[in-house]
Amino acid sequence: KKPRVGVVGEILVKFHPAANNHLVELLESEGAEAVVPDLTDFLLYCFYNTGFKADNLGMSQKSKKIGRLGINFFEWLRSAARDEFTKSRHFTAPAHIDDLARYARDIVSEGNQTGEGWFLTGEMLELIHTGTPNIVCTQPFACLPNHVVGKGVIKELRHRYPGSNIVAIDYDPGASEVNQLNRIKLMLSTANKNLAKQNAPEQKDQAAGLSLIHI
């Protein structure tokens, strides 16, 4: 098995290879499986936010209804793919935006809507719940929203999920690429150690089974 590493963060740095120094290629070259959540989820997050704004910040109920229609439409579009991913042993089906909101709600308020807002916390929790406890949280240097809902929640996530292995990486033209690489490789080293611990009982069981067959 390869260690699975999720990539989350500010939308440009998360998806654009030139902005994150080809992070996905780096992870794969180091023997990890990169897991990058859908771009569609960010659009659904924007639709979902209209509900909170209508209920708490004076936005019209019409906007809330339009947002919910948008969510239902996009979820319908990818429902066939989600069903097939659910049946597969090799792929993970994307979570519903309502599930992401429910995950995040225990840690940050849905009122955190600047930038990636609560959605970033929800994505990290989705990865942890689907077997990807190793996470790189990417952010532009001095990105205040990410410091609150990204780097700011890492301590709480580690407290609630002791097996989580999360590192926040700042990307900036003036930042040292060597420092970024060192932090990512340290995270991967921990990921490989944790994976070896998980595989140890399975290997013992297999060895015991082979011994019985030999006898």
Predicted ranges, named:
Residues 1-99, 103-107, 111-112:
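A charged, amphipathic alpha-helical module
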Residues 2-3, 201-203:
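Short coil/turn segments at secondary-structure boundaries
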Residues 16-32, 97-194:
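Hydrophobic alpha/beta core scaffold segments
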Residues 44-46, 143-144, 201:
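Functionally engaged cysteine thiol sites
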Residues 54-63, 185-196:
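A polyampholytic, Gly/Pro-enriched intrinsically disordered region
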Residues 192-197, 202, 210-211:
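Acidic, low-complexity intrinsically disordered regions
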Residues 213-215:
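Conserved small/polar residues in nucleotide/adenosyl-binding loops
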